[in-house]
């Protein structure tokens, strides 16, 4: 009998692990380590008198991330669903605490970090994971209410508003955009009415637009984005240096370690703008490969979501869709900012940019997805009734 003829729940344990997902995850993390070492070497040598300062710390974060992932992968998804409410309250509490002077750590004008000894935790990263878990739980339990009533539409909108408001107080405009866009997409997939969804989009666009217009430095970023070369030595400096890096790379790049932009020309070369260094050292070909790996990872996550939906597992399905959408938005924004397609925002490239909080939460999200896939592979299939409207739309959206 061929393996394809054996039901998933009867396969050996080693074959129930999603090796495709695991290999993509490890490949992106490995590339991240190499690129952090390359992009940060000059800055680390001058600032810390140790060329491998950031690379060493990145290795520590990778080890911590994998240890945390091993812990998370052992937690049943039913536990996350049951404790989604307390998780939300704890996260909101942390978002408030980080704003208190003397407790929250201010870096580059933003108060986003809580110092925990050897590591500073960026609370907005925890908020992203919390949002996926909480709203997947909420929509799985109340998708009929979401589809047929105003209450089901307004309740999650209120929670999103609290999240976004606290993030903007830090301020963290980029995370607020990613989080709200992810939740809005999850609401649509879960079955919110089309005209409710359109109203949601208009509220979101109007709100974020108002925040940008009323904030002078955000407005300046928008103006600079439209023509960065008009003020290339001041407000447009970072973006123009990033574009120069893309131009230097041409088709195949200058080679690993040969970037010129990382030599104090491009600020944040090892964090928010690491994709520009990838494009400079490996060219268009290397940039396309990185994007391709992310596309493959996201597609696989969405396939896992669809498979869980087909089995009637609503919470894991919506949570997996949330993780896939979250990664999609964050990769799109980071790549778009680096290449000049979007206004500058402070968002990391998942798995690749230097940043302990980002890497740890990315590992947690991947372990969460691995757990969802593993549970679906060992579950004995049960007959599933004709899906209701929210499920039907979800299947059609992922087909």
Curated annotation (Swiss-Prot):
Q: In which pathway does it act?
A: Cell wall biogenesis; peptidoglycan biosynthesis
GO terms under cellular component:
cell division site; plasma membrane
Q: Which UniProt keywords apply?
A: Cell cycle, Cell division, Cell inner membrane, Cell membrane, Cell shape, Cell wall biogenesis/degradation, Glycosyltransferase, Membrane, Peptidoglycan synthesis, Transferase, Transmembrane, Transmembrane helix
Kindly report every residue range on the membrane side named Periplasmic. 42-58, 105-115, 169-171, 215-281, 338-348
Residue ranges that the UniProt entry lists as topological domain Cytoplasmic = 1-20, 80-83, 137-147, 193, 303-316, 370-399
Listed GO molecular functions? lipid-linked peptidoglycan transporter activity; peptidoglycan glycosyltransferase activity
**GO terms (BP aspect):** cell wall organization; FtsZ-dependent cytokinesis; peptidoglycan biosynthetic process; regulation of cell shape
Q: Which residues form a coiled coil?
A: none
Q: Main subcellular localization, coarse class?
A: membrane
Localisation per UniProt entry:
Cell inner membrane
Residues annotated as transmembrane? 21-41, 59-79, 84-104, 116-136, 148-168, 172-192, 194-214, 282-302, 317-337, 349-369
Q: What is its EC number?
A: 2.4.99.28
Q: Which domain of life is it from?
A: Bacteria
Swiss-Prot/TrEMBL catalytic activity:
[GlcNAc-(1->4)-Mur2Ac(oyl-L-Ala-gamma-D-Glu-L-Lys-D-Ala-D-Ala)](n)-di-trans,octa-cis-undecaprenyl diphosphate + beta-D-GlcNAc-(1->4)-Mur2Ac(oyl-L-Ala-gamma-D-Glu-L-Lys-D-Ala-D-Ala)-di-trans,octa-cis-undecaprenyl diphosphate = [GlcNAc-(1->4)-Mur2Ac(oyl-L-Ala-gamma-D-Glu-L-Lys-D-Ala-D-Ala)](n+1)-di-trans,octa-cis-undecaprenyl diphosphate + di-trans,octa-cis-undecaprenyl diphosphate + H(+)
Its record classes its membrane topology as:
Multi-pass membrane protein
One Pfam family hit: FTSW_RODA_SPOVE
Q: Which family does it belong to?
A: Belongs to the SEDS family. FtsW subfamily.
HAMAP family recorded for this chain? PGT_FtsW_proteobact (MF_00913)
Q: What does this protein do?
A: Peptidoglycan polymerase that is essential for cell division.
Protein known as: Probable peptidoglycan glycosyltransferase FtsW
The source organism is: Cellvibrio japonicus (strain Ueda107)
